């Protein structure tokens, strides 16, 4: 396989087309062409390479194109002033802002049909992962057929099917109404719609709850409304103070710590986190189910000490940048 390799020396970047092959259980890499030091000219340089590389380049087109676009927007951001952040390093901030720049300058300006197709691709990834984190056994390919063709997977419970279909409905409602204000009504409605046909206990819980396999104490039932009032107040006070990803990540953690509902807190929290991002001009993110243990560990560490928020926010940033260039390009 071939891919682009970036070598950084000081403040300068140099690009190479690199080939990787497995031989006798070992991976051998070799630089086969120097592509220059300007990411904006790399695409042209690749087109000028000898025909013997065409087949391999075509096979790796998406990987190569992803690299070029991501680094093109990263270079644009590097030339701009970025406000220092206590939770994110400059490198991580630059990667987030590169996604934001492409989101606003390219993706959101695409024609409606293209946007809807890409949003559907995102929804499939998001719905599969957010429900899988909670134990849904529907596979990605099955989720795709269910959400795009309404083909019900065999031997799956109605709960699992509703789980995905409800996520689809709520997601597109947010996409079509990004200006919705974050308040008690929106939070309750988001939860109730996500749990429709799954758990009919609506509204904030009136009973104490223990979180299965999670070692933390949620807000006692009599204080849920008071803590949710404080959370919404905190959100409103910090909306223009914190970086949107930091705001969304910290809101998510605080929400999960309160655990305001009897069930569906994780799914609701991840949906609200994406609503916060999009309402503030930032792209959406997918927390992958394969990262479940790391994700829960980061949430738990922040429970014990808010100084660990940095680890949680950096985790969210990594999930955003990875999912963005894989889906929205």
Question: Could you tell me what each predicted segment is?
Answer:
Residues 1-263, 268-329:
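FIC/Doc superfamily catalytic core
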